[in-house]
């Protein structure tokens, strides 16, 4: 339903476009984060830190985050992003993500940590897209 909500948002704002990101274009590296692989391949720039995406996101007033898994991939992506963008720029939709089974404690601690750093954490039903 996240894809449909993003598309509906686009339709209501003809001059704006939601930006969906794919990761792991290199099958020989592990990508937890969307921004970089765990061990970058020196011969493959797609495995290095994605500063194009970071700089693009820096221009946004609000960055709405959803995805899987909060304990691993999404969490690492957010950690990478908040090294360059203030956590207060982000809204984490807590009901649009979940941890890997058995890692619920890590996801809970992550949400608490990011909340203390200024990230808004809320359910998708609490988000008013008109404010974004």
PLM segments and residue spans:
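Active-site-adjacent betaalpha module
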Residues: 1-132
């Amino acid at each position: 339903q996240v894809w449909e909500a993003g598309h509906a948002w686009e339709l209501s704002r003809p001059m704006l476009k939601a930006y969906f990101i794919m990761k792991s274009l290199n099958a020989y590296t592990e990508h937890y984060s969307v921004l970089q692989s765990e061990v970058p391949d020196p011969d493959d720039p797609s495995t290095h830190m994605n500063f194009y995406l970071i700089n693009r996101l820096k221009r946004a007033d609000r960055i709405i985050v959803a995805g899987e898994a909060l304990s691993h991939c999404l969490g690492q992506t957010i950690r990478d992003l908040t090294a360059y963008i203030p956590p207060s720029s982000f809204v984490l939709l807590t009901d649009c993500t979940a941890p890997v089974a058995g890692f619920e404690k890590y996801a809970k601690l992550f949400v608490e940590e990011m909340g203390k750093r200024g990230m808004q954490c809320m359910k998708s039903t609490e988000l008013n897209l008109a404010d974004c």
